[in-house]
UniProtKB/Swiss-Prot annotation:
<feature type="topological domain" description="Lumenal">
    <location>
        <begin position="20"/>
        <end position="229"/>
    </location>
</feature>
<feature type="topological domain" description="Cytoplasmic">
    <location>
        <begin position="419"/>
        <end position="452"/>
    </location>
</feature>
<dbReference type="Pfam" id="PF02990">
    <property type="entry name" value="EMP70"/>
</dbReference>
<feature type="transmembrane region" description="Helical; Name=2">
    <location>
        <begin position="303"/>
        <end position="323"/>
    </location>
</feature>
<feature type="short sequence motif" description="Golgi retention signal">
    <location>
        <begin position="590"/>
        <end position="592"/>
    </location>
</feature>
<keyword id="KW-0472">Membrane</keyword>
<dbReference type="GO" id="GO:0010008">
    <property type="term" value="C:endosome membrane"/>
</dbReference>
<dbReference type="GO" id="GO:0005794">
    <property type="term" value="C:Golgi apparatus"/>
</dbReference>
<dbReference type="GO" id="GO:0009505">
    <property type="term" value="C:plant-type cell wall"/>
</dbReference>
<feature type="transmembrane region" description="Helical; Name=8">
    <location>
        <begin position="522"/>
        <end position="542"/>
    </location>
</feature>
<feature type="transmembrane region" description="Helical; Name=7">
    <location>
        <begin position="486"/>
        <end position="506"/>
    </location>
</feature>
<feature type="transmembrane region" description="Helical; Name=4">
    <location>
        <begin position="366"/>
        <end position="386"/>
    </location>
</feature>
<dbReference type="GO" id="GO:0000138">
    <property type="term" value="C:Golgi trans cisterna"/>
</dbReference>
<feature type="transmembrane region" description="Helical; Name=9">
    <location>
        <begin position="554"/>
        <end position="574"/>
    </location>
</feature>
<feature type="signal peptide">
    <location>
        <begin position="1"/>
        <end position="19"/>
    </location>
</feature>
<keyword id="KW-0967">Endosome</keyword>
<feature type="short sequence motif" description="Endoplasmic reticulum export signal">
    <location>
        <begin position="581"/>
        <end position="586"/>
    </location>
</feature>
């Protein structure tokens, strides 16, 4: 237990040290009257397309003198954050009333640029003393008109800041756009714009330590919690009923099988065996494509370990709201540090299956998940570059990730592979395998791989689909998700149901005298990932307002990688459960 605990503390310390948080220049967040408080403009973009964001000054706002880019951590860059010094001066407890910071004549091209942005519901994001600020840049006045050509477009030119403070610390900031101070963008003509801002300070009793609670509470409101707990209870009841029903049948059938086989042993020796005992000489025959199978188990085990560590960090409060860069940092760091687990698992299991080319197996393990992810990233990063979006990673960040993969991930993968190869573990089979495989009898269509995968994936998916909406709304929207304890319960339910349904289907497969259960159990366990991807289609077209080539490609591209990861992880869980079950039942009977 000491190694996982030490690793968790190391990762947490690394993330807390600044790898993913938006840190101000004032490290202690204490200010005197008139002190400059850091204010950074982050990004702008269509409200319904969270991946399609641009630099704040890509819109033709007034660019002040001495604009500086903030040095960002890895997680911030991966999150698409591009912070620059903002044009507003919000010094501590310094009130301002309609102060003009810029007068500008907008050209026809700039008016058209702003109008397109307003039409797409562009919003902006800033950070003031690490606190997030949002607002829309303009509004569309439709006035009950159905013809879009008659709509009027306006740009907000007056932003009103209300800042709450407690003694020498900033506690909260709100930004409101003045609905009466507008610039008409409807016509393609030059327009004079006078941008201004107002600052009001108010004292509050809220402590500095609780200033982020406001953002976490939005997902913990009573009616939201009721929905989450209702979904949990509904999932638990459904799962208990279905798994209980299957367990009862399976236990009864197994009991009858054991009694039948015990009686057969006392009967005549020439009596023909039937059912799963009949194939005892083939059930532990190693699967085809041993190297790919072992690599899949190695990658799935690594992703399972990664998920557990992410849950541990979330439950101790590392991923608080608007510290989303920390999640990306944690994913990169933990994936790199756990690559040795993939190497060890794949190599040791491959050697147990009497594989000879362990180097090839190790290369396959290293590229099985990273390969598709890298190809997807290359395509999507090219799209982001074409759009000049902040999602396009800078060359320096790509070099950092390549160095992490080269100097950390790959060496640990090789070390784990060498350790697995030298473990000298033998595959534990309770019965001997015959020299020649038995022929599998003809089976009905519903016992083939695809129908079995459909049945195996539906039950686990039904246990998590309600919670999926909130996760999607957080990852691909602006909803805040902080109820990690509920999400962890859902994850445990998912694992239990996946393991159980895979065991049940494996038994029915063996009972039909089909001994090729290795790959089938893995595919059945991982099929929930396919259901999640099908849900992506439903969510995109029915529950979201995302649009455009970039957002569509980002959504389906990265969700394909995530669902593929779930496929490998849950496939590993399903196979491990099935292997324990098969070993148990064949250890419980006497086979010649």
């Amino acid at each position: 237990m000491r190694l996982p605990t030490t690793l968790l503390l190391f990762i947490g310390a690394l993330i807390f040290s600044g790898a993913g948080t938006v840190r101000s220049d004032a490290s202690d967040h204490r200010y005197k009257d008139g002190d400059s408080v850091p204010l950074y403009a982050n990004k702008v973009g269509p409200f319904h397309n969270p991946s399609e964001t641009y630099r704040y000054f890509d819109l033709p706002f007034c660019i002040p003198e001495g604009v500086k880019d903030k040095k960002e951590a890895l997680g911030e860059v991966l999150n698409g954050d591009r912070l620059v010094s903002a044009p507003y001066k919000l010094n501590f407890r310094d009130e301002k009333d309609s102060e003009v910071y810029c007068k500008k004549k907008l050209s026809r091209e700039e008016v058209e640029h702003f109008r397109r942005a307003v039409e797409k519901d562009y919003y902006f994001q800033m950070y003031y003393d690490d606190l997030p600020i949002w607002g829309f840049i303009g509004k569309v006045d439709k006035e009950s008109k159905s013809d879009p050509s008659e709509f009027k477009y306006f740009l907000y030119k007056h932003i009103q800041f209300e800042i709450l403070y407690n003694k020498d610390r900033v506690i909260e900031i709100n930004a409101r756009m003045d609905p009466h101070s507008l610039v008409d963008l409807t016509e393609d003509k030059e327009v004079d714009a006078e941008f201004m801002y107002t600052v009001k300070w108010k004292e509050t009793e809220t402590s500095f330590e609780k200033r982020m609670d406001k953002y976490a509470m939005s997902s913990s409101l009573p009616h939201h919690l009721e929905i989450h707990w209702f979904s949990i209870i509904n999932s638990c009841v459904t799962v208990l009923l279905l798994t209980g029903f299957l367990a009862t049948i399976l236990m009864r059938v197994l009991k009858n099988d054991f009694m039948k086989y015990a009686q057969d042993e006392e009967a005549a020796d020439d009596q023909e065996e039937t059912g799963w005992k009949y194939i005892h000489g083939d059930v532990f025959r190693f699967p085809k494509n041993k190297s790919l199978f072992a690599a899949s188990l190695g990658s799935g085990t690594q992703l399972f370990t990664l998920t557990i560590f992410i849950f541990m960090l979330s439950l101790v409060g590392v991923f608080y709201p608007y510290n989303r860069g920390a999640l990306f940092t944690a994913l990169v760091v933990i994936y790199a540090l756990t690559s040795g687990i993939a190497g060890y698992t794949a190599s040791s299991f491959y050697c147990q299956l009497e594989g000879k080319n362990w180097v090839r197996n190790l290369l396959l393990t290293g590229g099985l998940f990273c390969g598709p992810l890298f190809l997807t990233f290359c395509f999507l990063n090219t799209v982001a570059i074409a759009y000049s979006a902040t999602a396009a990673l800078p060359f320096g960040t790509i070099i950092v990730i390549v160095l992490i993969w080269t100097l950390v991930t790959s060496p640990l993968l090789v070390l784990g592979g060498i350790a697995g190869k030298n473990s000298k573990a033998e595959f534990q089979a309770p019965v001997r395998t015959t020299k020649y495989p038995r022929e599998i009898p003809p089976l009905p269509w519903y016992r083939s791989a695809v129908p079995q995968m459909a049945m195996a994936g539906f039950l686990p998916f039904s246990a998590i689909y309600i919670e999926l909406y909130y996760i999607f709304a957080s990852v691909w929207g602006h909803r805040i998700y902080t109820i990690y304890s509920i999400l962890f319960i859902v994850f445990i339910i998912l694992l239990i149901v996946t393991a159980f349904i895979t065991v049940a289907l494996t038994y029915f497969q063996l009972a039909a005298e089909d001994h090729e259960w290795w790959w089938r159990s893995f595919l059945c366990g991982g099929s929930t990932g396919l259901f999640i991807y099908a849900y992506c289609l439903y969510y995109y077209y029915a529950r979201s307002d995302m649009s455009g080539f970039m957002q569509t490609s980002f959504f389906f591209g990265y969700m394909a990688c995530i669902c593929y990861g779930f496929f490998l992880m849950l496939g590993t869980v399903g196979f491990r459960a099935a292997l324990l079950f098969v070993r148990h039942i064949y250890r419980s009977i006497k086979c010649e």
